[in-house]
Design a protein with these regions (language model features):
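A structural motif shared across PLP-dependent enzymes of the aminotransferase-like
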Residues: 96-104, 118-132
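Mid-domain Rossmann-like dinucleotide-binding core that forms the NAD(H)/NADP(H) cofactor-binding site
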Residues: 142-204
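Short N-terminal binding/cap micro-motifs at the start of the first secondary-structure element
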Residues: 10-19, 44-46
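Short, compositionally biased
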Residues: 101-117, 194
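Residue-level marker of beta-strand positions
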Residues: 86-87, 127, 171, 191
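Glycine/charged-rich beta-loop-alpha catalytic/anionic-binding loops adjacent to active sites
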Residues: 134-144
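Glycine-rich beta-strand-centered segment in the early N-terminal region that forms part
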Residues: 23-41, 53-104, 108
Length: 204
C-alpha cells in the first residue's frame, strides 16, 4: 500500500516525509477492524512526531497521522460483522490509563497512554487497523470533514465536559480561535449552551 512515511526526525519535517510503499497491516485480530482510508487529516501532533517528542522514544521510519475517515473492509475473528462496509472515524487513543479521580480525564503523558500516529504507526496510509471500540459510525458525512473531527473535538470535549464540567450559561474564554481545538471548543460550547468569548490576533 501507499503511505506518508516519516523517514527520520528533523527540525524541518516536510523534508523527511514522502509518499512510499509500505506493507499492508496484518489481518485484524479479535475486536479490531481494518479500515480503508478515504481521507486523513493533519494535526499538530504530526509535526511533533516528525520533530521528535521530548521523553518519547520513537523508531523510524514510521507512518504518522491520528485522524481519519474510512470504510471498514475486514474485521477480526469473533468481531461483529455488521461493521463491514460502514464509514467510520477514529479515536486514536488505543490505550488510556485510569483517571486519578472519577471526574478527571486520562493524562496524555501517562506511561500507558498510547495513540495511533504517535506510539504506533498511524493513519496516513491506504489501510490501518484499529479496535472497533475506537471507531464511530458516521454515515452521510463528507469524509474530508469527518476525518478532521477526532483529536480536536475529543481534546475539547475532555477539557470542557470531563474536566471543567461546563454547563449551560457558563462563560468560556477561548484564545486563538483560528486553531483546530479552539474551533472545536467553540462548537461544543454552543452545543452545551455555554457562553463562549473568543480572542484572536485577526480583526474580524
Amino acid at each position: 500500500m501507499k503511505a506518508l512515511v516519516i523517514s527520520k526526525q528533523g527540525p524541518i519535517v516536510h523534508e523527511n516525509v514522502a509518499l512510499a510503499d509500505w506493507p499492508e497491516p496484518p489481518a485484524p485480530p479479535t475486536g479490531h477492524a481494518r479500515v480503508r482510508t478515504l481521507c486523513s487529516a493533519l494535526n499538530h501532533l504530526d509535526l511533533w512526531v516528525g520533530k521528535g517528542v521530548p521523553g518519547l522514544k520513537l523508531s523510524y521510519p514510521r507512518i504518522g497521522g491520528s485522524d481519519a475517515c474510512g470504510i471498514i473492509d475486514a474485521v477480526g475473528p469473533d468481531t461483529d460483522a455488521s461493521w463491514l462496509g460502514k464509514q467510520v472515524i477514529l479515536n486514536a487513543a488505543t490505550a488510556r490509563p485510569a483517571a486519578p479521580r472519577p471526574d478527571d480525564p486520562p493524562s496524555p503523558i501517562a506511561a500507558d497512554y498510547e495513540l495511533l500516529g504517535e506510539h504506533h504507526n498511524g493513519v496516513h496510509a491506504q489501510f490501518f487497523n484499529a479496535p472497533v471500540d475506537n471507531l464511530q459510525h458516521v454515515p452521510n458525512i463528507d469524509p474530508a470533514h469527518a476525518a478532521a473531527f477526532g483529536l480536536t473535538f475529543l481534546t475539547a470535549y475532555s477539557m470542557l465536559v470531563t474536566k471543567a464540567q461546563v454547563r449551560p450559561g457558563h462563560f468560556v474564554l477561548i484564545t486563538g480561535i483560528g486553531g483546530g481545538v479552539a474551533t472545536a471548543t467553540l462548537n461544543l460550547c454552543v452545543a452545551l449552551g455555554a457562553r463562549p468569548i473568543v480572542t484572536s490576533r485577526q480583526q474580524w
